[in-house]
């Protein structure tokens, strides 16, 4: 075979959740690895716009969309909402009003995929059917329907009724596909009726007989999955954990591929769920963080890294309102160091694949300031950001160092404004906080000694000062909690001005203590 085909797809039933990017990144990385191994490959990505509209996302007006339940997604009007930023039309071009529901949400997702640097070949499921590319697969499935029904029963235990056919017709009268039932096939046309066969949509009560070809019908999805393997010649296609379990959809599709279509199914790469804050995502219900929302919180290389650095068999638990993002940056930085040291192991490979092939400059060595320290510095208007980064680096900054620092500052501000935990947020107060008045005498005396310590050691670095503070605490015999809570309340701004983020990082690593008030100690002592 000249070109190996890697494929993935997503149904555009609503705002597509970030978990769907795991499949995108895995398949994109496989395609790249094949190409680098001198094995030509193509990465096909399908926006499935032919599935029935079966649920209304919570953020849409139910009364407005209820009458469209049961229609193919491409036949449902686009929501009357602002066009998603960067969304692409079916022809791959930017701008314009999305022509239907599937294009509204699918276009938004395609824009995220392109931003991540994956050169996928996008297509729509409706085009496969309407252009006749699925005709042979439909004919074979209809003629071998009893075999498909037997496979369903043997794999999952689900018994199909007599004369069952694995297709849904698009009703000639109401245009719905989710409410029809195929009754018989005479070799040319399928007889069907449109009724109340599902709980989520209402049929028109009519029926007829029509050709199932050229978009008149679609295969039911497990049979359709195998048919796409057959029609597109797919060699690699992974699937989520829920589909890849024993007796699941993938096992059924693989058997249909072999026994009905006479082909070997593609290599499967089962991958685990992506949780946001411990919850599994749902596209059609509008539950969870969308791909676009998370893509706005992280630069492309970090989002790619997030999807790659854990084994596909492990759950990714991502909580932007906790420590996940600072920890993710720290992990990325450790992988970068391994790559720059000339390592050839998994860390170095994952770091390289976290950058698009076209981004060779992004692989160049640079200073990587800790994200948690950057998040602190951007909240300190009295500090010159790049000067503080230079102090951390211990050398003059090159252009790539500045670019990296400024990118991290941009995303740190975005994170702080949207969802960062309170412990990462700081505010310089202009008036004495009420809590400062409650400091006990021993705390005030301790602060006076700290002031003297600072004045006596004006050039001490953060690490040295950290040690001297511990010595002072021991000498005074003050409880650690009382000593450090007074420092947090009254002293941190002074230390930040004098020692910059270097002190902040070392200090907070040892003494994480939630607070939101910073006040100069000299007001108290």
Task: Locate the predicted segments by residue.
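Basic, alpha-helical terminal appendages of large translation-related enzymes
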Residues: 1, 13-16, 42-44, 157, ...
């Amino acid at each position: 075979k000249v070109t190996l085909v890697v494929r993935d797809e997503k149904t555009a039933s609503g705002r597509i959740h970030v978990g769907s990017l795991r499949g995108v990144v895995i398949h994109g990385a496989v395609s790249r690895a094949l190409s680098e191994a001198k094995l030509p490959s193509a990465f096909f990505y399908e926006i499935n716009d032919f599935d029935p509209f079966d649920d209304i996302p919570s953020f849409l007006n139910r009364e407005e969309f209820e009458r469209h339940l049961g229609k193919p997604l491409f036949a449902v009007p686009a929501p009357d909402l602002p066009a998603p930023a960067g969304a692409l039309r079916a022809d791959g071009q930017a701008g314009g009003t999305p022509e239907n529901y599937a294009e509204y949400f699918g276009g938004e997702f395609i824009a995220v995929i392109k931003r991540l640097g994956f050169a996928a070949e996008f297509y729509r499921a409706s085009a496969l059917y309407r252009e006749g590319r699925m005709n042979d697969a439909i004919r074979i499935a209809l003629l071998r329907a009893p075999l498909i029904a037997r496979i369903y029963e043997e794999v999952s235990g689900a018994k199909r009724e007599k004369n069952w056919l694995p297709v849904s017709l698009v009703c000639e009268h109401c245009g719905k596909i989710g409410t029809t039932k195929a009754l018989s096939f005479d070799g040319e046309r399928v007889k069907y009726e449109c009724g109340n066969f599902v709980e989520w949509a209402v049929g028109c009560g009519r029926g007829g007989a029509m050709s199932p070809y050229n978009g008149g019908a679609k295969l039911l999805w497990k049979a359709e999955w195998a048919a796409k393997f057959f029609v597109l010649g797919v060699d690699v296609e992974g699937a989520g954990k829920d589909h890849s379990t024993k007796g699941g959809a993938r096992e059924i599709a693989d058997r249909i591929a072999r026994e009905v279509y006479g082909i070997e199914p593609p290599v499967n790469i089962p991958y685990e769920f992506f949780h946001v804050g411990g919850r599994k995502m749902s596209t059609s219900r509008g539950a969870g963080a969308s791909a676009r929302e998370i893509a706005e919180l992280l630069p492309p290389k970090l989002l790619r890294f997030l999807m790659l650095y854990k084994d596909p068999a492990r759950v990714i638990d991502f909580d932007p309102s906790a420590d996940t993002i600072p920890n993710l940056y720290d992990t990325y930085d450790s992988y970068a160091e391994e790559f720059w040291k000339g390592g050839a192991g998994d860390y170095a490979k994952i770091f390289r694949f976290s950058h698009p092939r076209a981004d060779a400059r992004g692989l160049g060595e640079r200073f990587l300031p800790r994200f948690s320290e950057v998040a602190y510095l951007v909240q300190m208007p009295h500090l010159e950001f790049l000067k503080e980064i230079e102090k951390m680096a211990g050398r003059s900054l090159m252009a790539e160092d500045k670019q990296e620092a400024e990118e991290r500052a941009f995303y740190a501000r975005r994170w702080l404004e949207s969802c960062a935990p309170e412990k990462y947020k700081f505010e310089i107060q202009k008036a004495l906080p009420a809590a400062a008045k409650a400091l006990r005498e021993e705390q005030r005396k301790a602060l006076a000694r700290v002031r003297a310590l600072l004045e006596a050691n004006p050039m001490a670095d953060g690490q040295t000062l950290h040690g001297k503070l511990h010595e002072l605490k021991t000498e005074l015999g003050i409880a650690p909690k009382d000593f450090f809570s007074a420092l947090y309340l009254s002293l941190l701004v002074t230390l930040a001005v004098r020692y910059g983020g270097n002190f902040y990082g070392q200090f907070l690593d040892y003494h994480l203590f939630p607070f939101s008030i910073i006040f100069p100690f000299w007001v108290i002592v």
